[in-house]
Swiss-Prot record:
Binding site for 1D-myo-inositol hexakisphosphate: 168, 172
Species this protein is from: Arabidopsis thaliana (Mouse-ear cress)
Protein name: Inositol diphosphatase DSP2
A molecular function (GO) term: inositol-5-diphosphate-1,2,3,4,6-pentakisphosphate diphosphatase activity
Superkingdom in the source lineage: Eukaryota
CDD domains the UniProt entry points to: PFA-DSP_Siw14 (cd14528)
Lineage, top ranks: Eukaryota, Viridiplantae, Streptophyta, Embryophyta, Tracheophyta
Keywords linked to the UniProt accession: Hydrolase
Residues annotated as site: Transition state stabilizer: 198
């Protein structure tokens, strides 16, 4: 074998390898180009500027507080405001489920109207004290654990109170679930004030229909509620009866779990 090296024009080098095979000669040719690093052309300034140009709307995609995807076509968050509108538009929503009892802000209503988004509002009080004044968490839990005892009343000081909040919560969650599980309403966003407790209860009840184990349901609830996790909410999720909703159609991704 012998190597033959020749100098080529245009600063190129050609190396030829000569091999003898079966009495014949086989040549392999390799061309190597020498690059002058001092003479590399640069893109024009206009082209560089075009590469860096980003539409203003894309720089303002701010998700609402505690935003997350729940399932295909289902999202959750805290109460969205005008800073979140550009982001929400990217979701292509058909519906919003609001779990807040307060009148929906006019600015938000205008946004929904201009984007063809339907609003389903199921007002659930966010503070236990507003529904059960003066009752501590332990007493509220006792109310919840006895919710099927129709004649049961509970004393707080010298006053008596029944269990209105438990029944209202159960009723509102069931109404909201019917909207949530109807795929005609998807894509859909669920929200309360901060996307923790009321939203967590609704999502947790949906998980029961998806046959999640209660440990996983509570883990998801606590992941969003964090240090604000309420024992009362967790008891509600443990006790929520889905038997009357088992025939509700669910065709989205996790329905067969």
């Amino acid at each position: 074998m012998k190597l033959i090296e020749k100098t080529m024009s245009m600063n190129q080098f050609r190396t030829m390898e000569e091999e003898k095979q079966d009495g014949g000669e086989l040549f392999h040719t390799i061309e190597v180009a020498k690059v002058d690093r001092n003479n590399v052309s640069q893109p024009p300034p206009a082209a560089t500027a075009a590469l860096l140009e980003v539409p203003g709307d894309e720089l303002n995609l701010i998700p609402p507080l505690n935003f997350s995807m729940v399932d295909n076509g289902i999202f959750r968050s805290g109460f969205p405001d005008s800073a979140n509108f550009s982001f929400i538009k990217t979701l292509g929503l058909r519906s919003i489920i609001s779990l807040c009892p307060e009148p929906y802000p006019e600015n938000n209503m205008q946004f929904l109207k201009s984007n063809g988004i339907s609003l389903f509002q199921f007002g659930i009080e966010g503070s236990k004290s507003k529904c059960l004044p003066g009752l501590e968490n332990e007493v509220w839990l006792h109310i919840w654990s006895s919710k099927h005892q129709k004649e049961d009343f509970y004393t707080n000081g010298n006053s008596k109170t029944s269990e209105p909040f438990v029944d209202i919560l159960d009723q509102k969650i069931r109404e909201a679930l019917k909207v949530l599980l109807d795929e005609k309403n998807h894509p859909l966003l669920i929200h309360c004030k901060r996307g923790k407790h009321r939203t967590g209860c609704l999502v947790g009840c949906m998980r029961k229909l998806q046959k999640w184990c209660i440990t996983s349901i509570l883990d998801e609830y606590k992941r969003f509620a964090a240090a604000k996790a309420r024992v009362s909410d967790q008891r509600f999720l443990e006790s929520f009866d889905v038997s009357g909703l088992k025939h509700t159609p669910m065709s989205f991704s996790c329905s067969n779990r």
